[in-house]
């Protein structure tokens, strides 16, 4: 992220999506006013109509309205980035936005880094997977992603949850064998 410039680019957008796990349309709808730098949070309360004529729309569901905690480095970077931008205007939207444009930029970055190509939505999945592997509860991950229920999270990340459960079984068995 040290290569990022001090002007708004899709790279900043990709960084924010990967650090927060928010949806593409939620990230597009962000305005400087949505950032609470002193509390290190980001308010998600709307989406951007990128498939239609542009403009703000409601979130996917009631649970999608949420505050996402951010790390201090991201807070510092975005405080500087949005400092002189209009409070109520979307940070990343200039004219018509195509999902394919942003996915193309991400694809180029993936290829340059020599890693498998993923989409912007793939960044959301990666974010959630990293949290689950770090031991964050399913309930917390569901809240952070704005899922309507934990069931959504459990279904979507079943493969990871199963992998973690088999790790847990190993830990349990080791603990039990040490009880002699």
In which residue ranges do the predicted regions lie?
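Structural motif
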Residues: 34, 39-41
């Amino acid at each position: 992220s040290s290569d990022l410039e001090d002007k708004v680019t899709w790279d900043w957008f990709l960084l924010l999506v990967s650090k927060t796990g928010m949806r593409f349309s939620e990230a597009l709808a962000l305005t400087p006013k949505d950032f609470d730098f002193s509390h290190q949070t980001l308010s998600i309360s709307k989406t951007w109509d990128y498939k239609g004529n542009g403009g703000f729309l409601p979130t996917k569901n009631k649970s999608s309205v949420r505050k996402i905690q951010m790390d201090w480095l991201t807070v510092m970077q975005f405080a500087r980035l949005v400092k002189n931008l209009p409070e109520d205007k979307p940070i990343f939207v200039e004219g018509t936005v195509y999902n394919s444009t942003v996915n193309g930029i991400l694809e180029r970055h993936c290829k340059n880094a020599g890693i498998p190509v993923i989409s912007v939505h793939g960044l959301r999945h990666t974010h959630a997977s990293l949290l689950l592997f770090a031991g964050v509860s399913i309930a917390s991950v569901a809240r952070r992603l704005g899922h309507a229920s934990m069931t959504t999270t459990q279904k979507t990340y079943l493969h990871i949850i199963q992998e973690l459960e088999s790790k847990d079984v190993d830990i349990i068995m080791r603990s039990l064998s040490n009880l002699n």
